[in-house]
Amino acid sequence: MLAAGPFVLGAHLTFADGAGDPAPVKTEGGKYYDKEGNPTFKVQSDGTVDWSTYSGFRRYHSDCHVCHGPDGEGSSYAPALSSYLKTKSYSDFANVVVNGRKNVSTAQENVMPAFGTNRNVMCYLEDIFVYLRARANDAVSRGRPQKHEDKPEAATQVENSCLGLKN
């Protein structure tokens, strides 16, 4: 498990090498997982995205796009996350988000703050990963997904629990 301030992540924290095949092979509580156990996306032939991808889009644009740019494409001072997730697993992503990262050399100074105690990020970390993974694999285009699955009851329960709300 990964401890992050008052949060404990780990229900599906994996330690696979790289991103792997994003194809969903398992569903649990309305979420999809690949063969390595990484959270992943599901996009139907009509363009309907799963709830996690849609939620991830919303949460990414709430907390991450200021530095990493619209749709995970990067900015002048933060890398493109859509490219980063082509080779990284959920555990790699979670480690950087929870603990932050500092990459300093004579030519650059890139610092990402730790978000391990930010409930607006941590309660939706899998969703943010799923959205960015879908972008990295060109499964969703830029902009807000037009159609999405309904929010699963399990997602509401997990969200309320993480945010300290009553179910």
Predicted segment positions?
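Axial heme c-ligation environment in periplasmic c-type cytochrome domains
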Residues: 17-20, 75-82, 100-127, 132-152
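Electrostatic cytochrome c docking/interface patches
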Residues: 18-59
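Solvent-exposed, acidic/flexible segments
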Residues: 49, 53, 57, 86, ...
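Bacterial N-terminal signal peptides
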Residues: 1-8
